[in-house]
Amino acid sequence: MMLRKLVLAVVLLTSAFVQNAALSSSVSPSVREPGTDSALAHPLAQETSREMCTERRHPCLRDSLAMQAGMPPSTTQAGMPAFPHPGFDSNYKLSLPSPVQDKNFYLLSLFQRNPVVRRLLSQRRTLQQLAATKAAALKRAPGCNDVRCFDQLIRLDGPTIEAVATELQALANRPEFKLLAKRELRPSGVFITYNNQSDAQMLVAAWKDAAKGMNRILSVYGLGEAPRYKDIDRVSYDLSSEAYRIILKVKTAEIKFAKAPLFFEPTLNFALMLLEINRRDEAGRFEPLEQGENKAAVQNLTEIKWNDYPYSFILVLGSGGLDLTTSISPIGAKRTDVAAQLFLQHKAPLIIVSGGYVHPMQTPYCEAIEMKKYLMAKYKIPEAGILVEPQARHTTTNFRNAARLAFRYGIPTERTALVTSSEDHIASSTRDEFRTRNISELGYFPIEYIKRISLVAAEFKPSVASLFFDANDPLDP
């Protein structure tokens, strides 16, 4: 009997591995041109009752073996099996007690919060010297009379970044850092871009991303260099003004850090201070979502019978207000109307409203929050049916951030989702140029495929690559 069970387990493992390898080699993300479908009144040729064991990530494998051993299958927040994804563990819970820092610099937060890792870092002579140098520089910074002086004292130059990389390369082979990679770096999905690299390579790549991210904040919000989208993301002050120099002096003098700071903490704290004085905390607003705006919807996920719906969720792409007094624009309202109609037609059990504090710059209104209010007030859609994604600032990140919610909350990502927006927006989002834009701005395509099915809607599948945190975009990393 034991031999039969062992043979069965080996057969299951081998079969799943072969199936996954074959599918992985034959399936690639694509942007498809609009088809001939003109309405949403039909099932859209999307089979919704497929057995999940036939999907590309062989999701039933782990639980079938678990049940043979007399153990219950693991589940996600949505009540679905906790399927394994390459480079991501759906049971991993992100720790975001300081969300602006944590989402921009998750690696550095892990360094700070792990006492064993922190001690090992603080014992390296090269890193000790760097910490002392930057701490002394930060203490001198209030004496600066222009923004370039601050920058020269605090910025991490190329040789310094490489010197730290060398130290981390050496530390990566220690069991404490291997454990950090096993328990945090890899299962978090935050560094999924480097999933195929060794632990040491992932650690070094993540450090270089963090260093470039800190320097990027210094460039944009310290020196006033133009961000990619300058109309909405730029610095909030006239950097040549006496008022700004006074603010910098005062706030820099207030920066606190440990008596024996880690090598990155002086630069990190200065960068975070720049975001603070420019009122650029968008990345952390409403976090943790699952305990606030998304609490009701997340708690309801286990009640959803996913096979009763042709789509897993409906994504609504936000549209900013016309001025600082407009809570939701006519375009935004129209897009939300379409989503409500699809929801009431039972196309999906959830609506994800996506959009942050975007247009105009420093608007007091969050697109996603206003769309949620609109859905609840006009259509009486229950809060449990609406997930809020309140940070996206562009179409690229609308898709990326919605994918993150789906993977983090355990929404079945092997199923197709629906996106709705205005006609021209859907048209542009389903062209090949949209893939090019994503790769240029994000470094990857956050969608496995997208296909236009009507003038105002397209179906798509989210990509697990979306979990990667991007420190180059501090307002929505």
Which residues make up each language-model segment?
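Signal peptide processing junction and immediate N-terminal pro/mature segment
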Residues: 19-41
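Serine/threonine-rich, low-complexity intrinsically disordered segments
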Residues: 16, 38, 77-78
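Bacterial N-terminal signal peptides that target proteins for export
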Residues: 1-7
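Bacterial N-terminal signal peptides
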Residues: 9-16
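A structural signal for short, hydrophobic/glycine-enriched beta-strand patches
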Residues: 43, 48, 53-65, 70, ...
